[in-house]
Amino acid sequence: MRVKGGSTTRQRRRRWLKLAKGYWGHKSIGFKTAKQAVVKSWTYAFRDRKQRKRDFRKLWISRINAAARNQGISYSQLMHKIKQSNIEINRKMLAEMAIHHQSDFENIVKLAIAKSA
């Protein structure tokens, strides 16, 4: 006698379709394509969790560079002078200051230039 799976198969398929809820077209309806789409989405999620860190670092660097150039110094020179003068501040905080607290950022730039000279 042939065993078709019954409730077990239905539950397993429903679980995959629930994960594919909101997907476009047959990816949310068909079991096989839904499963493939969900697995692919997990791959993208894993990859992009790593990529997000790189993207934010790029964003911080470009913001610091723009603010530093307004002060007449390039990003690389500024970071070198900050390291030389033992100012312990990370790029995230520098970028935040460059956007929201320009006067404090200017003070750090002046301090780094003065200490390293």
UniProtKB/Swiss-Prot annotation:
Q: Does the keyword RNA-binding apply?
A: yes
Name of encoding gene: rplT
Which UniProt keyword terms apply here?
A: Ribonucleoprotein, Ribosomal protein, RNA-binding, rRNA-binding
State the InterPro entries in the record.
Ribosomal_bL20 (IPR005813), RIBOSOMAL_L20_CS (IPR049946), Ribosomal_protein_bL20_C (IPR035566)
- Name the domain of life this protein comes from: Bacteria
- Coiled-coil annotated spans: none
Kindly list the GO CC terms recorded for this protein: ribonucleoprotein complex; ribosome
Its job: Binds directly to 23S ribosomal RNA and is necessary for the in vitro assembly process of the 50S ribosomal subunit. It is not involved in the protein synthesizing functions of that subunit.
PROSITE patterns the record matches? RIBOSOMAL_L20
Descriptive protein name:
Large ribosomal subunit protein bL20
User: What Pfam families does the record tag this protein with?
Assistant: Ribosomal_L20 (PF00453)
